[in-house]
Structure formats: structure tokens, C-alpha cells
Amino acid sequence: MKRYATLSLLLGAAWLGAADAADPAGSGAEPAIVYSDAALPTHTIYRPARLMDRYPVVLWGNGSCVNSNFGYREFLAEVASHGFIVLAIGPHRDSPAPREQRPADPADWPPFETHYSQMQDALEWIAAENGRQGSPFLGKVAVEKVAVMGHSCGGLQAVRASVDPRVTTTVVLNSGMMADDDQYMRRHELERSILGEMHAPIAYFIGGESDIAYPNAENDWQALQQLDLAAINANLDVGHGATYQMPNGGPFARGPLAWLQWQLQDDAQARAMFVGAACGLCAGSDWTLRRHFPQ
């Protein structure tokens, strides 16, 4: 818990960026645009500039549960450019506000800036837009293909939102649960038993042993072995902050993007990143991959 508290103090300062920084477009075949809609002012939309197909939805939660996705814009635009509609908590182009020193005990912290229910709010909005005459999303949303995904504190938001029956897969980045009596867990309205309530495949992408969330993710992995649920745990030695701010999300983006492409787009090449003895994240890569695929 103390490790996550330390992270919360650091991220706001680390992700302050130039207000005039150009929005990235990603490297995929469908360059992304980034904006907010007046009807969903609490979120930023990352999506292909030209909506030529039906696109899966990715719901995003930020590290420290801050109300800003500014530090993830390279990564999220990269995801969108490969054919996804990403709805990220936080208004467009807002940088995290500087923070004062928090008390050591999370019981004394002010409330989180954001809540897992904002993922559900975004899903309700995009589903309505899919059927609204005059909407750019009319008939363009694959509402049956939905991922919840987040970094660190946002990863816990994704776990909490994952029991929604509309969720197709959960992606946990540099995160993992604590003990039930941990104040951090209570603030997320989380208990470890939620793993047993999950109904869809789950993927953990962690930054190696130097990642402050590594022990938490390991505990979750052990629990997942007992469940009839497809799951992976993939580590790349990049630490807790990973490479989200690098162009197109850097090398860490490769794993989560492939998982989304497999789970939500039925992409055979993406599947090969995780399945088989010679899989893309297996031996010979910089990743360490563990898999639990019940028959």
C-alpha cells in the first residue's frame, strides 16, 4: 500500500506536459484523432479519424486515479489507430494538477479524483451514440466487444468494473490487488473475491520485479490459477511507469495492444503473440509470459 501511495505523489509532477503539445495519431493503419465531446465532458475520446467499420470499445482508467489521461496520450492514440474507440477518464489535454504531500495513511486521504463507475458511464454513452441519428458513431460501435483497462490505480478501477456483463476482457497494467483490509482496496470498493466473479479473459502486463505493483500482481496470478478463466501474466523489465509516454507508447505497448487485437478483433497474428510454444511473447523475446488457458 505504501508503495502505491508514493506513486500517487510522483505521477502528477512527472506527467506535467506542454499545453500546446500536438495530439499523437498512432502508428496504425487508421490514424487517431483525440478530443472531448460536450455530451461526455468527463472523458477524452481517442478514435480512428475516419470511422469506416464497427469498432470495439476500450474503457481507460489513469494511474493514481487522477482526472487526466495526458500522460498516456501516446499509448492511447496508438491503441485507437489500430481500430479501437478508446474512452479515457479525464478531459482532453488536461494535465494532472500538482499535489500536496498526502498523509501516510490512506484512511486520511481525500477521495480519489475519479471512480470506476465512470467507465460504465462512458460505455452507456457510446452505446447510446451507436443508435443516435446524427452521431458520428451511428452504427460504428461494436458494443458487444468491450475492454476495461487501466494503469496502476486505474488498473484497480478496471478490475472493479470487470464484473459488468458487457465486458469482454480486462487488461490490468502495472497493478494488482492488496489484502481486503487495506484502505486502498476499501476506497476502490474492492475485495479479492472479485476475481471469482469475473466472466471474461484477463491479462496482466507488469514492469518486472522493479515494478512496485509486481508483488500484488503475483498474488493475483496465484489466485487466478484456481479459476476456470483464461488469464495471462506478462512482464517486461520497464518498471512501474512503463513506456506510455514514449512515441506510440514505446515497447511496453506491444503486449496490451496485441491482447486487445486478439480478444476484441479476433486477429490471428495477435493471437500468436500469446498462444503456442513459439509465441511472440515467449522465449526469445524480452517478455516473460505465463499463461492459464483452461480447456
Residue ranges and their predicted role:
Residues 237-241, 246-295:
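Alpha/beta-hydrolase-fold serine-hydrolase catalytic core, especially in secreted/extracellular enzymes
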Residues 36-141:
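Serine-hydrolase catalytic machinery in alpha/beta-hydrolase-like enzymes
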Residues 60-64, 152, 175, 207:
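Glycine-rich His-Gly loop
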Residues 19-47, 279-282, 290-295:
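A domain-start/cap signature at the N-terminus of enzymes
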Residues 168-246:
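The feature captures the conserved acid-bearing segment of alpha/beta-hydrolase catalytic domains
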Residues 1-6:
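Bacterial N-terminal signal peptides that target proteins for export
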Residues 8-14:
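Bacterial N-terminal signal peptides
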Residues 124-197:
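Primarily recognizes the serine-hydrolase "nucleophile elbow" in alpha/beta-hydrolase
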